[in-house]
Amino acid sequence: MRDIDSVMRLAPVMPVLVIEDIADAKPIAEALVAGGLNVLEVTLRTPCALEAIKIMKEVPGAVVGAGTVLNAKMLDQAQEAGCEFFVSPGLTADLGKHAVAQKAALLPGVANAADVMLGLDLGLDRFKFFPAENIGGLPALKSMASVFRQVRFCPTGGITPTSAPKYLENPSILCVGGSWVVPAGKPDVAKITALAKEASAFKRAAVA
């Protein structure tokens, strides 16, 4: 069983995926893995999300997790579908305690110091900084990281292929989350693979 730190270190960019059509699940996963991005966050925002997770985890090399996990029940459902990690937009005590009890690799969302302190109280120290660009971007994250030196982040929300490398220069950032690698609409496998190759080459100060 992987912990969330090891998941975050696998690739510089974690694609944030919204699967609308179950037929797209396998080709998207294959294209991303072929491009060097093997950590796939499938958001639980569509009716076919859990089924998509089951399909994508069968793709060799794919490490599949669930995003938009809002409560303990959703975490359990994602775990049953075979997820290796779980991402939430925020953090509640109930969700955090449940994840710790289940030894689940949870990456909870934080937006301020109080959120981080709650996570630390629950035994968590890896967080999704969300929605990154709307809450001050890299300057805000740098300020937060200077206070919580043991914490590592995955900023998500408004990250672009232009801004991602700047975030990854910060040693408190293990990876970034982004949706740009899978543009909306019917998947263009060649384009997804090309975007993934570009993103997988981003350098990280926090990961040798």
UniProtKB/Swiss-Prot annotation:
Catalytic activity: 2-dehydro-3-deoxy-6-phospho-D-gluconate = D-glyceraldehyde 3-phosphate + pyruvate
Binding of pyruvate, residues: R45, T68, K128
UniProt cross-references to CDD domains, sorted A to Z: KDPG_aldolase
EC number: 4.1.2.14
Pathway it works in: Carbohydrate acid metabolism; 2-dehydro-3-deoxy-D-gluconate degradation; D-glyceraldehyde 3-phosphate and pyruvate from 2-dehydro-3-deoxy-D-gluconate: step 2/2
SUPFAM superfamilies: Aldolase
Cell compartment(s), UniProt: Cytoplasm
Pfam families: Aldolase
Gene Ontology annotations for the cellular component aspect, listed alphabetically: cytoplasm
Active site location: E41, K128
EC top class, as a word: lyase
Induction: The eda gene is monocistronic and is transcribed from a single promoter. High-level expression of the gene can be attributed to very efficient translational initiation caused by the high quality of the ribosome-binding site and stability of the mRNA.
Site residues, Plays a major role in determining the stereoselectivity: T156
Record key words, sorted: Carbohydrate metabolism, Cytoplasm, Lyase, Schiff base
Keyword Lyase found: yes
GO molecular function: (R,S)-4-hydroxy-2-oxoglutarate aldolase activity; 2-dehydro-3-deoxy-phosphogluconate aldolase activity
Matching PANTHER family: 2-DEHYDRO-3-DEOXY-6-PHOSPHOGALACTONATE ALDOLASE-RELATED (PTHR30246:SF1), 2-KETO-3-DEOXY-6-PHOSPHOGLUCONATE ALDOLASE (PTHR30246)
Record text on subunit structure and interactions: Homotrimer.
Family: Belongs to the KHG/KDPG aldolase family.
Role: Involved in the degradation of glucose via the Entner-Doudoroff pathway. Catalyzes the reversible, stereospecific retro-aldol cleavage of 2-keto-3-deoxy-6-phosphogluconate (KDPG) to pyruvate and D-glyceraldehyde-3-phosphate.
Protein name, UniProt field: 2-dehydro-3-deoxy-phosphogluconate aldolase
Originating organism: Zymomonas mobilis subsp. mobilis (strain ATCC 31821 / ZM4 / CP4)
Gene name tied to this protein: eda
